[in-house]
Amino acid sequence: MGIMEAERKTTGWAARDPSGILSPYTYTLRETGPEDVNIRIICCGICHTDLHQTKNDLGMSNYPMVPGHEVVGEVVEVGSDVSKFTVGDIVGVGCLVGCCGGCSPCERDLEQYCPKKIWSYNDVYINGQPTQGGFAKATVVHQKFVVKIPEGMAVEQAAPLLCAGVTVYSPLSHFGLKQPGLRGGILGLGGVGHMGVKIAKAMGHHVTVISSSNKKREEALQDLGADDYVIGSDQAKMSELADSLDYVIDTVPVHHALEPYLSLLKLDGKLILMGVINNPLQFLTPLLMLGRKVITGSFIGSMKETEEMLEFCKEKGLSSIIEVVKMDYVNTAFERLEKNDVRYRFVVDVEGSNLDA
């Protein structure tokens, strides 16, 4: 069932140009269709991708752009054919709001690999209307791309799980790396990396954090529970780790050499790339051939994996380490994020902010 035209206007904070500066922006929500869920947004995490998109770092940004793809809110209306949700449910929306439904990935419930997937923002619906993200009062999303937040999970803690959490959970699940006793490495300790440590530890893995400096050692070992911490340039320590890891999750989003991390892998070990890097990466093929090692990639996660991940995090008592901010601080938060000055994820308190300011 639809909603009144007067109620279809909402306000978000949008970037207007590649400066990336956000300010209030009023726009029209799409009508609530038969399978749509209308959501009053409570909070939204800030991902590094939001920074790239608002500044047009990837060369494909469209403005005005309301970012945000780690959205948690309350259902205020459901379409006539919605069966999964009722008014009052606390729900989440991640990176996607649409897919074709008929391709091979969609048929396998891997909609994140659909060639016609629709992003939560900086994209268009099939009718040509722009998609807008979670830095706003409300959003309307097809029920397929909405998940229930487990009862008892704090909304601000749930938000980063919808991107950072599922991004590391998905490859561990898909590549058969969930069983206890494995030895893994997490390269890079940002928003995704810190959840990688937590999730891998909760699966019973021995986890080594690999970083470029010592500044996060204490946090990694004491706050996140990592078993070891290695500086990538420490040749002696890296040599000690050679041929010892079942996998390395590489979250680094800038160009870097792969050989040092390939050398850490056991026979059949996997180097799983997650950082978006536009420059070609190089490696020596014998490093792969002589250990039957694998370089692979993984991209966010499916809706089924997102649901599994949320239940896993609830069961294990996992949460993100976050800093909650108001919307009027968001531009400063973006500046700090660009300098990696956050431990480990900003979450915008949308409900408690004046978006019209």
From Swiss-Prot:
BP-aspect Gene Ontology terms: lignin biosynthetic process
Origin organism lineage: Eukaryota, Viridiplantae, Streptophyta, Embryophyta, Tracheophyta
Gene name linked to the record: CAD5
Pathway per the UniProt entry: Aromatic compound metabolism; phenylpropanoid biosynthesis
Residues binding NADP(+), per UniProt: 49, 167, 188-193, 211-216, 251, 275, 298-300
Family: Belongs to the zinc-containing alcohol dehydrogenase family.
NADP is among the record's keywords: yes
Binding-site residues for Zn(2+) 1, renumbered to this chain: C47, H69, E70, C163
GO CC terms, sorted: cytosol
Keyword NADP among record annotations: yes
Superkingdom field: Eukaryota
SUPFAM superfamilies according to UniProt: GroES-like, NAD(P)-binding Rossmann-fold domains
Entry protein name: Cinnamyl alcohol dehydrogenase 5
UniProt keyword terms in alphabetical order: Lignin biosynthesis, Metal-binding, NADP, Oxidoreductase, Zinc
Subunit structure: Homodimer.
A family per Pfam: ADH_zinc_N
Catalytic activity: (E)-cinnamyl alcohol + NADP(+) = (E)-cinnamaldehyde + NADPH + H(+); (E)-coniferol + NADP(+) = (E)-coniferaldehyde + NADPH + H(+); (E)-sinapyl alcohol + NADP(+) = (E)-sinapaldehyde + NADPH + H(+); (E)-4-coumaroyl alcohol + NADP(+) = (E)-4-coumaraldehyde + NADPH + H(+)
UniProt EC number: 1.1.1.195
GO molecular function: cinnamyl-alcohol dehydrogenase activity; coniferyl-alcohol dehydrogenase activity; zinc ion binding
Species for this entry: Arabidopsis thaliana
Tissue: Expressed at the lateral root initiation sites, in the vascular tissues of the primary lateral root and the root caps. Expressed in the hypocotyl, cotyledon and leaf veins, apical meristem region, at the base of the trichomes, hydathodes and cauline leaves. In stems, expressed in the cells associated with the vascular cambium, interfascicular cambium and the developing xylem. Expressed in the vascular strand of petals and sepals, anthers, stamen filaments, stigma in flowers, and abscission, style and stigmatic regions of siliques.
Cofactor (UniProt): Zn(2+)
Signal peptide as annotated in the record: none
Cofactor: how and how many bound: Binds 2 Zn(2+) ions per subunit.
UniProt xrefs under InterPro entries: ADH-like_C, ADH-like_N, ADH_Zn_CS, CAD-like, GroES-like_sf, NAD(P)-bd_dom_sf, PKS_ER
Role this protein plays: Involved in lignin biosynthesis in the floral stem. Catalyzes the final step specific for the production of lignin monomers. Catalyzes the NADPH-dependent reduction of coniferaldehyde, 5-hydroxyconiferaldehyde, sinapaldehyde, 4-coumaraldehyde and caffeyl aldehyde to their respective alcohols.
Family annotation (CDD domains): CAD1
